[in-house]
């Protein structure tokens, strides 16, 4: 089977979901191509889309929250939004790309390509199965104006929310958010720490801010370091934000208990090595930590879908969170000291996690294309 995965460079979460599906499909012998859809219109378009999104999220997050609220108000299955028509402009280019490469199925972990694919279906330009994958624990605006063959959603409890927004319930498959195989297995904590050159006999906090380095990370890290009185170590992964990385490295250059990391492909191993993770409530990072069974403290969300992610996790005792920085730090220390609370969260995570989403999505594509997987 020849699979096309369409994503967009608006943060690493969507790309991580796509890479998880790609990994699972290639493991089963399928041919997979994963691209940023907007590159079909040129690098300028791709950079403009990603630059605008990331710029708003990093520098004026309250405006992103406002846009999200407006989107929720105008989003409807009865009419098409400006977002739909903007993405529809790529119909012909995407149709030509799919036909020229003879793909058997297409899957997207991002709304924008789903809009384009839906327009193609309306114009009879799409003749292969198309599957969308939700990467947040809520139905974000404009999903209901798409028309995919199936929608993979993060959890069974979200079925009603998606259905009430206008997506046919028979198209909703609560398989989970796909994560790479490395997050579905565990390296022993001692072994992980040895490989990462971290101490074996002290508590370790892992602080993650996402690939964009979102949030008041420098302030948070400084306060956490001050509050660590029991020789705890802190590992800070600050994403692609090289400015924050430089600031933190300068701030903690004389503090051997603070380890500042930029973007890394060893997140899974760092999770294995830590005792508690502080993370912004992005759908992917939260799911990776959930699948890993690590006590989670959610930090300040990007207004919009991340606030919904926090609410979903807190309701099911999968994480703890607070809007106040000092309380967030306190909660992390409590999760280390209170073994009963720690164990309760781990039990809840084991009950709710869905580690096989990527494999099941590949199985769905095989069914839709009638691919024979027998030897």
Positions of the model-derived regions?
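C-terminal alpha-helical cap of glycosyltransferases
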Residues: 354-375
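Acidic donor-binding loop of glycosyltransferase active sites
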Residues: 272-282
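A short, well-ordered alpha-helix in the C-terminal region of glycosyltransferases
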Residues: 341-355
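Conserved N-terminal ligand/cofactor-binding loop architecture of enzyme catalytic domains
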Residues: 20-95
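Donor-nucleotide binding loops and adjacent catalytic segments primarily
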Residues: 199-274
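Active-site and donor-binding regions of nucleotide-sugar-utilizing enzymes
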Residues: 12, 69-166, 171-174
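C-terminal "capping" alpha-helix adjacent to the active site of nucleotide-linked donor transferases
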Residues: 314-340
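A nucleotide-sugar donor-handling region in carbohydrate enzymes
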Residues: 149-204, 208-211
């Amino acid at each position: 089977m020849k699979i096309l995965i369409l994503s967009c460079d608006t943060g690493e979460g969507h790309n991580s979901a796509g890479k998880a599906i790609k990994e699972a499909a290639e493991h089963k012998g399928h041919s997979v191509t994963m691209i940023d859809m907007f590159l079909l219109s040129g690098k300028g378009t791709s950079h403009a889309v990603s630059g605008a999104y990331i710029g708003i999220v990093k520098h004026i997050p309250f405006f992103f929250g406002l846009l999200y609220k407006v989107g929720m108000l105008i989003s409807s299955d009865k009419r098409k939004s400006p977002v739909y028509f903007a993405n529809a402009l790529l119909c012909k280019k995407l149709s030509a790309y799919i036909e020229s490469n003879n793909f058997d199925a297409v899957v997207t972990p991002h709304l924008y390509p789903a809009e384009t694919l839906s327009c193609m279906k309306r114009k009879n330009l799409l003749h292969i199965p198309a599957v969308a994958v939700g990467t947040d624990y809520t139905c974000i605006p404009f999903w209901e104006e798409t028309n995919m063959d199936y929608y993979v959603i993060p959890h069974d409890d979200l079925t009603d929310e998606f259905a009430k927004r206008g997506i046919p319930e028979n198209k909703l498959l609560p398989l989970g958010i796909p994560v790479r195989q490395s997050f579905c297995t565990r390296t022993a904590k001692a072994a992980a720490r040895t490989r990462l050159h971290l101490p074996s006999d002290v508590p370790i906090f892992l602080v993650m801010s996402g690939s964009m380095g979102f949030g008041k990370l420098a302030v948070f890290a400084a306060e956490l370091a001050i509050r660590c009185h029991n020789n705890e170590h802190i590992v800070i992964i600050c994403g692609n934000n090289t400015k924050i990385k430089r600031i933190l490295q300068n701030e903690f250059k004389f503090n051997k208990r603070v380890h500042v990391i930029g973007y890394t492909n060893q997140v899974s191993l760092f999770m294995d090595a830590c005792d508690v993770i502080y993370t912004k409530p992005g759908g992917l990072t939260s799911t990776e930590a959930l699948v890993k069974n690590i006590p989670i403290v959610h930090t300040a969300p990007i207004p919009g879908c991340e606030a919904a992610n926090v609410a979903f996790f807190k309701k099911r005792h999968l994480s703890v969170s607070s809007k106040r920085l000092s309380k967030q730090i306190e909660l992390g220390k409590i999760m280390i000291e209170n073994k009963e609370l720690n164990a309760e969260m781990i039990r809840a995570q084991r009950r709710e996690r869905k580690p096989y989403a990527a494999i099941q999505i590949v199985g769905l594509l095989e069914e839709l294309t009638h691919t024979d997987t027998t030897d």
